[in-house]
Amino acid sequence: MASFFVSKDVEKRVCGLGEILLLAIRRGFREYPSPWAVASKEIYVRHAAISITLAFAMIFFISVVAAPSPVQASEKENSVTLVALGDSLTAGFGLQPADGFTPKLEAYLRARGHNVRVVNGGVSGDTSSGGLARFDWAVPQDAHAIIIELGANDALRGINPNLTRANLTKIIEKSKDRGLSVLLAGMLAPPNLGPAYAEAFAAIYPTLAAQYDVPLYPFFLDGVVAQKSLNLADGIHPNAAGIDIIVSRIGPYAERLISNAASRE
């Protein structure tokens, strides 16, 4: 097995005929001296000609091995891009990158045979207003499906539920205008805001899901909220084990979502 560097960040490894060619190129550059090290014009010309030939051979070889195979190209064409637009619960606040919601959801879906890429569209501290404001640039143009996970910070700040509903309405409409398959993730308000606020807030999600005929995952933190062993020290954000619970519960909803998105392509 031989290797060469395409750039400072990319190393290619080759074997078989590719290894033979690469080793031959290396020998050529070792055996033929630099024009600055010899006085003979003949050696210089021969070295230059061989160097140019080998350089073109190397360029051709790199272009061949670096080009995506038909299988890779086909997989990319058939893949589904799912974006999770949300707040710190989506962003993976306080967690190692691999322990966040989006990478674990992608792993869950891929383990079940889905060719999917899950994009982290979460911003810690974001409200529904913030999610709406950044929708156009936060949701990739090549996205096929979206999970909308917003509203927790609205409730924590006591924002008028009517404003939250209006923002989520616009996000759903923008998603549908883009042709995205939508999964709406519900949220509940903390009890300290009183029963009237909690009731008005909780009604936002099923109402919008029915109005726009989109699937609803009733409560994003189902099975995790108020469980000390499943949350960080702040008692609000899930830890890695908590994320596992969330993914296992929302996972089947996400499977149906991307299957629906794939069938519409």
Where are the regions that the model predicts?
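Extreme N-terminal basic, low-complexity initiation segments
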Residues: 2-12
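Alpha-helical cap/lid subdomain in secreted, periplasmic
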Residues: 46, 104, 111-114, 130-265
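Bacterial N-terminal signal peptides
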Residues: 53-64
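Serine-esterase "nucleophile elbow" of acetyl-processing enzymes
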Residues: 71-124, 134-142
